[in-house]
Amino acid sequence: MIYKSLLLLLLPRVLFAQTPWVDSTLDALSLEQQIGQLFMLAAYSNDDAREDALEETIRKYHAGGLIFFQGTPEKQALLTNRYQRAARVPLMIGMDAEGGVGWRLSGCIEYPANALLGAIREDGLVYRVGKSIGRHCRLLGIHVNFAPVADVNVNPLNPVIGIRSFGEEIDNVSRKAVAYADGLASRGVMAVAKHFPGHGDTDADSHLVLPRVNHPASRIDSIELYPFKHLFATGMPGVLVAHLDIPAYDPSRVPASLSPRIVTRLLRETLHFDGLCFTDAMNMKGVTRGRKKGEADLLALLAGNDVILFPEDVAASVREIKEALAKGLISEALIRERCRRILVAKEKYVLPYSTPIDTTRLRQRLNAPEEIALKQKIYEKAITLVKNDRFLLPLARLDTLRVASLNFGDRPAKTFEQALERYAPCAHFSLSREATAADVNRRVEQLAPYNCIILYNSAARNSAASQFGYSDRLPALVQKLRGKRVILCHPAAPHALQPYALLPLDAILLGYSHDPIAQDYLAQAIFGGIRVEGQLPASIGPAFPAGFGLTTSKTRLGYHQPELSGLNSVALQRIDSVCRVAIRRKAAPGCQVMVARNGFVVYNKAFGFHTYEKKRPNAPTDIYDVASLTKIMATLPAIMMLHDRRQIALDSTLACYLPDLRTTDKAPITIRELLLHMSGLKPAIAFFQHAVDPASLIGRLLSTRRTPANTRELRAGLYINPSFRYRDSTFSFKEQEHYRLVSPGFYIHERYADSIPILLRHSELSGHKRYAYSDIGFVFLQQAIEAITAQPLNAWVQRQLFHPLGADDTDFLPLQTLDLQRVVPASDDQVFRESLLHGHVHDPTAALLGGVSGNAGLFSTAEDLAKIMTLYLNHGTYGGQRYIDSATIALFTRAQLPPGQNRRGLGFDKPETRPGKPSPAGPSAPAASYGHGGFTGVFAWNDPDNQLTYIFLSNRTYPDEFNDKLNKENIRSQIQEIIYSALLPRLDEKTTSTTSPDDYRLSIIHCPLSQSLAYQ
């Protein structure tokens, strides 16, 4: 009677609340059924042989719940529905999903280890992780997640906690654990803090033996218990008690999970925890060793636990409990009290979600784009910089660097290497951790030509048992690289870095993981694609304490999921359909689309093939003839840079820079007029037609209808006379003296080539200064640039712009400097040149001027073009270097005249703002936007209002330029409109760092899960 009175005093108030379902259900259960409710059995969705036996066990022993382990989401959902049908009282379904359901189930999102979350300064992101995991649990009918891990990782040799902990700082661990738990709670999922009273400072694995925490109670109270006390203060609904020997609390060597002093006295009475108390898995050797089957489960119940998790033998456990009841060692009142506590939890966490799991598109719903983006964000924000001598990172002045990477270890780092190549040319080497001294010396010799070495330590491991992957070959290598700039990238736990921390390294970055996403962000961090702001979750010796982390600025383009830049990736997928339809309709053999927003590339895909013969698929790294994009990618930046240097003035005349024009009608034309296409110059000179021998023709060269002479159809409404021949001393189809190569099998006589500048100089003017697009004007601008700089245009922009930017796949004359395999053929000109134009410029003027011209001739990739367009969006800076003054960018990119006169900026095209008039951009492009198109089917456009860059590349001129389906069907504008339709609503709240465990609720990423329509 005294025992029962004490028991009633200890029962939390929640057990006496009026809960009709709990009371009626409890009254309807027999004692045996109440005992069954105390057990959560192990379940697997990858073991068909166990399914029937488990269902029979549920029926026979009236199990209260299941904890699922490995398998697939679809099978687990089906099994959950099946097992729930077999249960009289709804089962409480649990999972050990610290990193999400993907921790256990294939094909689902697995979030990074808690150590990465501990490296993040923004607690709000941890809340969102918990919320996302909670959503996944709900989709799978999971009611309980055995997380967060509240252990403080103060022992580097801990074999079981390690990176599962948020770190070694008690405040950081507490805040992160509370944020994670509240995220779960926001989705109605029970969080269970573990491993009480703290598993962080152990050197043994409780799966195998009983670890000891050999500290005084005062130390445990101030370190190990600190996060748990914070969690309990927030109303933590569940706790998991570990199998630990803690002499300070119970000198009898009884595991904490079996100790009344720890479970009842410490947890319930001292810390006032009134939630559900779970044991750690009861099949672990740390608790079962030396005890007969079922004995430990009985002791756990007597200690004060509510739920026996993963019993070794449920039949033996039930038998032990019944025998204890018969002997009076345990009372029916205790069983009823524990059962009632479980039913109270079920009423809150199970009953509201008791409908069968919907398996429709389950895997798709478990992988929402917003959550894939959140996973990326975690890896990005965790990147930690602990050393940065002379502010080496982010790397600047790429034109001064010769970069090489070396993968130390035997795990491939392909993603890391490819990500480096987005920013600069990079040679790649590797060295095994088992390398000999001779191997090290050989690699050092191979690295001699390079002055910047990026080491990626793929040998690093998270386990103390493997000595964290240490090898003395890495220090030996670093010592031999003295005199070079050496950056170490560490993809593992901080503890693994300690032996290398004091080496002569210029910079040290931690990515904490070898995951491809982490590899990508490490590379981005090196070059300034992301801002680095992570903190150490655990110390690396005294030099680098927990919480330490340097910061860097974002200086270059980064790469991430569209949702992180406020774009809907599902909506952007419509671009794929438009491109495939365009290719199917033969608007072009292939194409590429790139979209960047807020300084991040969010979409970059290639479609189709280089040619209709389909021999080489298009790739995102392909190089295109960008035609008139040359104007804004080479000529225009040169003009702006010279304008900033006061070497060219907009209202100065051509004659100021080109004395040969002083006696011509071109002398008074100003630079401004050329940039506005208001100089009176003709659009172009038809040099091929100009060279046709009239004597070779019967009738006209071209006709709008078929005639006896004009028999070859070029396109609808255009026919050519195929019998034409070129005049002597103009062009030849065979190599001979005094002829220069134009394209394969096509040559120009040197006299005719020399006459082209003269023809341009004396070309006819229109007599008015109205807008009329002219290529000739940009040829004159090229000549002015070359006169001022005393260098060819291609050499000057390469040295002043492309190479410093890291745009090393951009150049004129690609056969001399670029990889021909990646160059997309522009045309198979069988009309005038009878040549395949593969690495030879398509534009006739540029071709006849030797391949370098101010109007065309440039070859480039989407990524390189994006770098230049981003320079414009950044008001003239890129990579931490200023190229053009911000005022100059503002001047050149704004409309110069009223819309009725000229919509253009200086060199840039602008949207047409007059209703009903054709526009180069889609109707959603704002007036502030600008860009340019190109004849080969290319387009580049910036929208500063929305911080958008859109690039479209194609070779629509293959096999010939007379295919205008791309323009007629408005393919480029269609895609641009899709981009605008994908813009997500602007949010007032932004992700911010937090110092209070309550502040994280204000934290948000660009696309909150609550706004997802397709995946709720």
Please report, for each region that a protein language model flagged, where it lies by residue.
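Preference for extracellular/luminal or secreted protein segments
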Residues: 18-57, 269, 291-564, 568
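Second-shell residues forming the walls of enzyme active-site clefts
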Residues: 30, 66, 74-91, 101-103, ...
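Catalytic loop of the DD-peptidase/beta-lactamase superfamily, centered on the K-T-G motif
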Residues: 559-597, 601-603, 769, 786-791, ...
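Short, surface-exposed loop or secondary-structure junction motifs
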Residues: 666-927
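N-terminal hydrophobic targeting/anchoring segments and the immediately downstream early-domain regions
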Residues: 18-109, 450
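Bacterial Sec-dependent N-terminal signal peptides
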Residues: 1-20, 998, 1002-1016
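Short active-site loop at a secondary-structure junction
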Residues: 574, 581-592, 614-677, 764-777, ...
